[in-house]
Amino acid sequence: MNNNELYVSLDIGTSNTKVIVGEMTDDSLNIIGVGNVPSEGLKKGSIVDIDETVHSIRKAFDQAERMVGFPLRKAIVGVNGNYINIQDTNGVVAVSSENKEIQVEDVRRVMEAAQVVSVPHEQLIVDVIPKQFIVDGRDEITDPKKMLGVRLEVEGTLITGSKTILHNLLRCVERAGIEITDICLQPLAAGSAALSKDEKNLGVALIDIGGGSTTIAVFQNGHLTSTRVIPLGGENITKDISIGLRTSTEEAERVKKQLGHAYYDEASEDEIFEVTVIGTNQKQTFTQQEAANIIEARVEEILEIVSEELRSMGITDLPGGFVLTGGQAAMPGVMSLAQDVLQNNVRVASPNYIGVRDPQYMTGVGLIQFACRNARIQGRKIGFKMPEEAIQEIAVSSSEEQEQHHHQNEVQQRPKGKQKTQAEHNKQSKMKKLLSMFWE
């Protein structure tokens, strides 16, 4: 079995906390484990209870660990767009080696030089994202390692965030027993996975409609230029349904997930469902169209605020259109309504990997892909190998399965003789069970 590098991403959202385990083979990502649990301790994207957030993180990791069959102790952590600032930066260093071949250490030094800027006391540097490297005046270089030169420059994007919010996030992750290998801005990571090169060059807005908030990320000329966070999301839709149908939040959430439709004109009059009237045992019947009337109003409001925010940023033309992602983007009718409200090209982006083909996983997948690419350029190690005991256990399980299969073939070929017991026929290896759980 190949022992490739493994990477784990942690996406802490208002509604759900998600862990994704990926295996990188060259530039190809293979998802081997997922944890997804309801979040506790967050409101509108911000941590309001440390202990509850730690508990949610631990539960998500436990779920992912059961799928992969070994402990997970490291993760790439996503930071949402709340209280984030973006600015241009640059750094310059002299190439240090005698033969003037640019080494990993030179790339590290120039990235550190780009961080030597004055930031407000209440802000911390989250990351520097290189736009291009310049070697002796030659620009548009994506990876300068092994090139010859005397002077190495980098032009990049400096990302800073609220010191308090970042400290709270990192404290929660560390208290959950997880070592942080990298920190990435979520809109940037999601954009790296959801958007095409052409879209980012032309100008595109990535709209991540989450549970507690909606994040706008604008990409122009190939790079992230600005982000905004709107404190409205799926939880507001659930609350509206609860009020409109006079039912509990739990029932409203069920209606939203199972029968929700965001576009009244496309919703069904024939699709009928029942909910319990809150405070009574009485049932009341509604159609999908009646629920859509409630949902459409809130989603339309969110999209109109998105338009207003873009205008306030001075963005009036986006030839690349809009790309929707996040958990609420999967709801039927959202794309049709967005096309009406935004008056532009709109599509919904989902990861194209087995087990995570849903817009809610776009950020988690993007965190792995984005962090891997940046770490490779800067010569940083953020992955880890599968534990030796786990490899041996899988190898033993695989060997036992092959032996069992061979023995079954022998038994089938015998005209007479003692047959295998039912228990032996039902025996499954650990990996087989793991795979069957994953494919469900």
From Swiss-Prot:
Gene Ontology MF term list: ATP hydrolysis activity
Membrane topology, as annotated: Peripheral membrane protein
Localisation: Cell membrane
Region annotated Disordered, chain positions: 396-440
One example of a Gene Ontology biological process annotation: FtsZ-dependent cytokinesis
Keywords: Cell cycle, Cell division, Cell membrane, Membrane, Sporulation
Entry's induction text: Transcription is controlled by three promoters. Two of these promoters, P1 and P3 are expressed mainly during vegetative growth. The third one, P2, is up-regulated around the onset of sporulation.
Name of one Pfam family that matches: FtsA
GO cellular component: cell division site; cytoplasmic side of plasma membrane
Family indicated by similarity: Belongs to the FtsA/MreB family.
Additional observations: In B.subtilis, unlike the situation in E.coli, the role of FtsA in the recruitment of other division proteins to the division site appears to be an indirect one, through ensuring that FtsZ forms a proper ring.
Complexes and interactors: Homodimer. Interacts with FtsZ.
PANTHER family the UniProt entry points to: CELL DIVISION PROTEIN FTSA, CELL DIVISION PROTEIN FTSA-RELATED
Record's function text: Cell division protein that is required for the assembly of the Z ring. May serve as a membrane anchor for the Z ring. Binds and hydrolyzes ATP. Also involved in sporulation.
UniProt protein name: Cell division protein FtsA
The species this protein was found in: Bacillus subtilis (strain 168)
Gene: ftsA
